Amino acid sequence: MSSPALDTIHDQTGEQDLHQEVQAQEHLPVEPTPEVQEEPESDHQDDDEQPEAQVLEQEQEQVAEQERLQDQEDQDQGAELVSQQPTAEEQEETRDELYNEVFGNQGSEASDLSDDEDVRMDEGEKYVPATATSAAKIPKFKKSKRDDEDEDEDEDEDEDDGGERRRKKKKRAERRRQRQEEEDEDEAPVLDEATQRRLALEERIDAIGKKPKAIRRKKKGDDDVDIVDSYHDDICARLRDRMIAAADKDEAANRIKMPGTAKLAMLDEVMGVLRNTTLWQSIVDNGVLEAVKRWLEPLPDKSLPSVGIQKAIFEVLPKMDLDTTTLKECRLGPIVLFYTKTKRVTPAINRQADALVQAWSRPIIKRPANYRSRYIESQNEVEQSQGGGGTGGGYSQSQRGPGERKFKRFDVKKALEENAHRKGARLQIVQDVQYTVAPEPKTHHHAEEMQHVSRIQQDNKKFNRFARQVKTKKH
């Protein structure tokens, strides 16, 4: 147990120790602590403006230094140019050379062009270049007279010099054009890719709107052969040989009971050439149609070629304008006629072959190709021609001679009188009839008997109209 006296002693000793520590700290050297003091706003602004002013001064010094260096470089270059400046003699020689290039000198091409006059400079006169105070002095040109002998010689040499002058003039024009093109290329601005593409597109659009230039074919001769025609002929000749070889391969494969695929393999290539309209004349000239006939012919076992081959060829043949002479040479008519008669082809191919036969046969039988002017015989005209002994040959009544017997047409009234005693009605027998001639239209049948009926109907219409008008007036 602690007494109050002991507590008092401990408190006193603690206070003494604390007092001694404070005194010891006071005798130690005091270190200054950084104190943050508030400064007025004007001081801060001065501190900010001071570095900005320093930066501006540095920039001005740099600019002045650069200008000084540039002036020094200009002075050095000027001194070099002065040292390299040509002398007066060199300038005079350069001007003389330029003058000779522009106006020509002795021995140049331009000096050979004068026939009736000789141009020369006066002796003692020279070209004086222009100066700061005086203009350039150009020498005078005078016409010198020739002797009569020289004139006679020139007249004899006119014909020989004419061709040479034209050649030299053409060469000079060509060189002038080349120089102009080079100058245009140098002066042309550099364009980016987008601008170049746009200009190219505009040029193509303008070219489409313009009319194409007529291409004149060269006349074929010993030394002058049209390259395009010869190229087309080579293509068609090679194609004909390959088509015949493919047909031979398929026939050989058919004989050994194997499928023939040679023609199918090159069908696309053949159709690409046959559809090209620019090659049609070469196709006819080089016998490609004979190879087409080989492709359409039946195989040794009497089988027909592939349906794809038939369809492709019969689609392109009507587009080719083949005349009678060409059809005789290529022998394509008999095979097309065979496709109109056989029943082993599709109806579409049969119709196409029939249309080809009709189109190719019109020039032979002297029939026009225009359907509007085409003439069709009627049944009445056929009967009349038969009744006249077959001499009419399909002529109309107006074209018949006066001595020919006129065939009497079917009399309806007489037929009704003959069948009047018959009782009952007979059923109509419907038959599938294929007409070889055009039947008589029903509108013209019994036309004479129906004329009075039409007159009565017209009179009735007039009377009804008149009756209506009278009624309206009464009301």
Swiss-Prot record:
Keyword terms, alphabetized: Nucleus, Transcription, Transcription regulation
Compositionally skewed regions (Gly residues) per UniProt: 386-395
InterPro entries referenced in this protein's UniProt entry, alphabetically: RNAPII_TF_IWS1, TFIIS/LEDGF_dom_sf, TFIIS_N
Positions with biased composition (Basic residues): 165-178
Subcellular location: Nucleus
Transcription among keywords: yes
Official protein name in the record: Transcription factor IWS1
Organism field: Cryptococcus neoformans var. neoformans serotype D (strain JEC21 / ATCC MYA-565) (Filobasidiella neoformans)
